[in-house]
Amino acid sequence: MYSSIGFAAQKVQISLSENVKKDLALTTDTESLDEVIIEANNERLNVRSSQMSANTLSTTTIKKIPVVLGEVDVIKAITLLPGVTSAGEGASGFNVRGGAADQNLILLDEATLYNSSHLFGFFSVFNPDAIKDLTLYKGGIPARYGGRVSSVLDIYQKDGNKREYHASGGIGLVASRLLLEGPIKKNVASFLVGGRSSYAHLFLPLFDNDNVAYFYDLNAKLSYNLNDNNRLFLSGYFGRDVFEISDSFANSFGNTTLNLRWNHLFSNKLFSNLSLIYSDYYYGLELKFVEFDFDSGIRNFNLKYDFTHYISNNIDLRYGINSIYYKFNPGDVTPTTEDSGINPFKLTDKYAWENAAYVDTEIELSDRISIHAGLRLSTFNRLGQDELFLYEDDNPIIYNESLDIYQKAKPIDTVSFGRSETIKSFANLEPRFAISYLLNEDSSLKASYNRMAQYIHLISNTTSPTPFDIYAPSGKYIEPQLADQVALGYFRNFKNYSFEVETFYKEVKNRLDYVDDADLIANDAVEQILLNGEARAYGLEVLFKKNTGKFQGWVAYTLSKSEQRTPGRTPTESGINNGEWYKSPWDKTHDISITGQYEFTNKWS
């Protein structure tokens, strides 16, 4: 007798004298029932787990959040969480616990995105229809993540439906989207493809406006089950923004990613994931009135091999390696006409190689105590380039004591390195630890510590990333940023509610600061305008959520302070602001967010 819930039973005669394997297709046998909604109880798991300072949002939750201009927005959704702020409308990126936007690691299917916004911050680069879920780590960051000192935003795309074809989309005031998914071979292979485009610029000529501003992006994913133990995924993203002001200038910028991923199941206790990843961020500017193009960007190739080992019911072990090769293009100028008057020139390309190995373990020591311990070893090699400037005493900035100002030092020589030669190397141990103590079935206390290293830097003297900014690697004159963070929290669940309160303290060493009148654009010696400083942030975060029922939502409150200082390098130097602490551009003492949704019927809310 073969039977399964929802299918009619079948009787089949078999011989007991020989080995037999039969695959049967059962016919459906359904009855109409009232709708039942099953939701994962993340709040209860959150009380028991040692993980803290992390928030997971499903696309269902994100789509329930009230929207502006008819567009569901992932980045605006996470800025409603405690500890997360935005520099404001029209500002790209987001800030976490007083950190800068470039200190956030943003991953889409494991590939790094260097700019998370369209139209200078009014929209995010994430198509909500293509997203499966996301997790934001503000602290207690697992050892499998590295490369940034503030946070990790880990986003995965849907795999595509392997049984049925589906289409979804939406039409907004300024943009529309469409997503298609379905089986290539039923129950074996599937596809997902989605696109978005804005069109508000099409109406500007009606108002005698020659300006142009629009974006478009494309998400795609292929999934293939080789067999019960092996799965392949190929996913990608391509996005572009275009902005033109009449006959003055035009610029375009955007991300490109590609990821080939292989999942392998060795046994029911050991799982692996091998990924080959490509990421690219491009910025192009055409200055029509002076007739030249300026292009810059950053590109990386990433190899990841991760293992998850379920040793016992109480012990999980994760370990793996990661290797990233970077190419930095600070910019090159190309005249667009013979009469331009601009000579072509190219800033020196830079190269680097970042490697890491990690181990993470989660252990339930008893019914009340759980720990999460990890260690990450990261290395960074600044590779060869043409014409590296040399300075007297290796000091690219000199201090004029009589004028009390910093000035550029004149290079005394240049030296060239081969592409595979190492100019300077760094290595850092990054320990991670978290512990949870269960007070009772509905409440717990948690504490965490993590150290993070960041080897690439956004060279920008604005409060938020802009397309004009460039990335630079650590090297002979630029030190990697190092952050230490501790947090303590109390977590409590009620019948339909959950409550979280956390306090944190974070210090960042080697935070870059800029001398007065720093020139960042088309600068082939940015070390002449940079000073090493430090930053700190501390605060209190509260999150109160209504998780079930017709009315759902949350209230988030953050009380925090974010400061930085750049002291003099010697007793005779004044530094910046006389070496005293001052508010960082991302300081926001009080921040409160309230979001809610009431469901009148299954179709109206």
Features from the language model and the residues they span:
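Surface-exposed extracellular loop regions of Gram-negative outer-membrane beta-barrel proteins
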Residues: 282, 327-339, 343, 381, ...
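Short, acidic, small-residue-rich periplasmic hinge/interaction motif at the N-terminus
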Residues: 3-8, 15-71, 75-76, 101, ...
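Outer-membrane beta-barrel signature, preferentially recognizing the C-terminal barrel domain
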Residues: 79, 251-253, 257, 261-265, ...
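A beta-strand signature from Gram-negative outer-membrane beta-barrel systems
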Residues: 22-24, 80-81, 125-168, 177-179
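Extracytoplasmic beta-strand/coil segments of soluble accessory domains associated
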Residues: 66-115, 132
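Gram-negative outer-membrane beta-barrel transporters
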Residues: 505-507, 526-605
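Short acidic/polar hinge/loop motifs at secondary-structure boundaries
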Residues: 64-66, 111-138, 208-213
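Transmembrane beta-barrel wall of Gram-negative outer-membrane proteins
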Residues: 172-199, 208-242, 250-274, 278, ...
